[in-house]
Amino acid sequence: MTVKTRFAPSPTGFLHVGGARTALYSWLYARANQGEFVLRIEDTDLERSTPEACAAILEGMEWLNLNWDEGPYYQTKRFDRYNEIIVQMLEQGTAYKCYCSRERIDTMREEQAAKGEQQKYDGCCRDKAPRDTDEPFVVRFKNPTEGSVVFDDHVRGHIEFANSTLDDLIIARTEGTPTYNFCVVVDDWDMGITCVVRGEDHINNTPRQINILKALGAPVPEYAHVSMILGDDGAKLSKRHGAVGVMQYRDDGYLPEALLNYLVRLGWSHGDQEVFSIDEMKQFFSLDDINKAASAFNTDKLIWLNQHYIKELDPEYVASHLEWHMADQNIDTSNGPKLSEVVSALSERAKTLKELAASSRYFFEDFAEFDETAAKKHLRGVALEPLTLFQSKLAGLNEWTLEAIHQAIEDTAAELEVGMGKVGMPLRVAVTGAGMSPAVDLTIFLVGKVRAEQRISKAIEFVANRINS
């Protein structure tokens, strides 16, 4: 049997980290078992579902590279199929029309609450013949009243619900639209889903859905209900903890590999290993290894992973993600070094791509003035001679190579009988406008000969004016 999983978000908001982790687990289980992964949009909540939210979900999935084999399917395009099954169930007696008014239902629940009883439908219309009337009605599933629903969850183990505790679920509303729990069942059946991976908040839906599947004569899939994600203070994850949409992490400068690596470890482990490539995730992932305890979101750990991937991934690939941030910060990269070279130069210190982009601006644009602190320390009178001598050596270079630039710096220091720092630091401030950069020879090489000469001239003028003032 081919393993087939699905991710079925509701387009009522962005794809948040909890949903992304569920999608990742479902995707990994399919990929680890040479199976198929289905994307389904559960948009039956017509009031809250929006095209913008749907687009955000698809964009998030694509950015994470969680590719799907089928879909996206939309529940709103399958209403005819749901209604077909509802008619079939009414004819077979596994569903019935309920004419109880909202007032009667509310009164019934109030009385049950006053008696300390479980609040559920009392079956008033369960065994009555359908009325030949225009009265409004809902359609309810005729849930078994005896026995139990039993299933073995990949994460939570053996779970059992007594049928006597389950309601006769509404499967079609008064206006005829099918309900969430019913649509899910028909979709999972029609799409051949063999394993449902979802959040623990769906556990109470599972026995109801299993009973509907059995009433339809449909196979029952396996289930894996994963725990919620908490903030580092133990409270349910919210925006103040960083529970933002997946694309916000892109905007903040995270690589998809870092977020995926972080999310897979939020509840799953393989020994003591912390860093996993996508191929390693597929190789080692198992639903049975997911921890049933809730996991705490730790932004520092995510930042650490992001730093790792910025340094370790192919600079060309990292540069492809950096392009968005350069454009977002209005940095024109058409006149400057290759972005992959910038990534190689700056990756050691960058925590995020957003930070990397901001720190690379001097490679592509001239700066208005020198950093005050750096200039005060390094563009003093003693810097005039090394800057002037190096500029003359720079002008005489026959080839623009890293080695030639490095040799020019060494020769300048040797001729002046000073340490490399006495030459390198003034040059760094001159060429970048600041006191921090990659190795000064590499920085000058990437800035380019014309820009480097212009900026050193500017620094010489700055120092001369300082001497004369």
Curated annotation (Swiss-Prot):
Cofactor(s) named in the record: Zn(2+)
Catalytic reaction annotation: tRNA(Glu) + L-glutamate + ATP = L-glutamyl-tRNA(Glu) + AMP + diphosphate
Motif stretch ('KMSKS' region): 236-240
SUPFAM superfamilies found in the cross-reference section: An anticodon-binding domain of class I aminoacyl-tRNA synthetases, Nucleotidylyl transferase
Keyword Metal-binding among UniProt keywords: yes
Cofactor descriptive note: Binds 1 zinc ion per subunit.
Main subcellular location: cytoplasm
EC number, as in UniProt: 6.1.1.17
Annotated S-S bridges: none
Pfam name, any one: Anticodon_2
A GO CC annotation given for this chain: cytosol
Keyword annotations: Aminoacyl-tRNA synthetase, ATP-binding, Cytoplasm, Ligase, Metal-binding, Nucleotide-binding, Protein biosynthesis, Zinc
InterPro entries: aa-tRNA-synth_I_cd-bd, aa-tRNA-synth_I_codon-bd_sub2, aa-tRNA-synth_I_CS, aa_tRNA-synth_I_cd-bd_sf, Glu-tRNA-ligase_bac/mito, Glu/Gln-tRNA-synth, Glu/Gln-tRNA-synth_Ib_cat-dom, GluQ/Sye
GO molecular function annotation: ATP binding; glutamate-tRNA ligase activity; tRNA binding; zinc ion binding
Annotated residues for binding of ATP: 239
Positions occupied by motif 'HIGH' region: 9-19
Family: Belongs to the class-I aminoacyl-tRNA synthetase family. Glutamate--tRNA ligase type 1 subfamily.
PANTHER family in alphabetical order: GLUTAMATE--TRNA LIGASE (PTHR43311), GLUTAMATE--TRNA LIGASE, MITOCHONDRIAL-RELATED (PTHR43311:SF2)
Protein's UniProt name: Glutamate--tRNA ligase
Species of provenance: Shewanella woodyi (strain ATCC 51908 / MS32)
Lineage: Bacteria, Pseudomonadati, Pseudomonadota, Gammaproteobacteria, Alteromonadales
